């Protein structure tokens, strides 16, 4: 029984910390003059707390593992909700596909250029020609 209560405590603590970061992100989003989603700010805050070792990973790991395990299931209601707007999506199909393709190409090209620059810098450092 004690082990069961310990596991329940770990999950409750993990979800509470994640929830606190989300609501802290909502507060920060309200204060900022630019529109950044509160959930993104909450994840950024959680990342900063974990990276700075202010928040132990063990406190959020059980809840995060559970959410990641069932992530696909969490997208089902959103996907069903999109079906209600199929007429709008079909009318805007071409712009959606074009923007996705162009965005993908931009990301691929940017990633390739950054990787090449990093590889060139690394090669120069190995040769002793550091900038």
From Swiss-Prot:
Listed GO CC annotations: plasma membrane
The UniProt record lists the keyword Transmembrane: yes
Coiled coil: none
Bilayer-crossing regions: 4-24, 30-50, 63-83, 88-108
Recorded superkingdom: Bacteria
InterPro entries attached to this UniProt entry: LrgA/CidA, Uncharacterised_UPF0299
The entry's keywords: Cell inner membrane, Cell membrane, Membrane, Transmembrane, Transmembrane helix
Subcellular location(s) of the protein: Cell inner membrane
Topological relation to the membrane, as annotated: Multi-pass membrane protein
PANTHER family, A to Z: HOLIN-LIKE PROTEIN CIDA-RELATED, UPF0299 MEMBRANE PROTEIN YOHJ
NCBIfam families on file: PRK01821.1
Family stated for the protein in its record: Belongs to the UPF0299 family.
Protein name as catalogued: UPF0299 membrane protein ETA_12980
Biological source species: Erwinia tasmaniensis (strain DSM 17950 / CFBP 7177 / CIP 109463 / NCPPB 4357 / Et1/99)
């Amino acid at each position: 029984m004690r082990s069961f209560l310990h596991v329940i405590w770990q999950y409750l603590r993990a979800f509470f910390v994640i929830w606190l970061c989300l609501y802290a992100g909502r507060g920060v989003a309200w204060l900022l003059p630019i529109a950044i989603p509160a959930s993104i700010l909450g994840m950024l805050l959680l990342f900063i707390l974990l990276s700075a070792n202010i928040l132990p990973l063990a406190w959020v790991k059980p809840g995060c593992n559970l959410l990641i395990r069932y992530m696909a299931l969490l997208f089902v209601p959103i996907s069903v909700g999109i079906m209600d707007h199929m007429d709008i999506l079909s009318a805007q199909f071409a712009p959606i596909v074009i923007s996705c393709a162009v965005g993908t190409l931009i990301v691929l090209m940017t990633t390739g250029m950054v990787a090449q620059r990093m590889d060139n810098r690394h090669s120069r450092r190995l040769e002793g020609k550091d900038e």
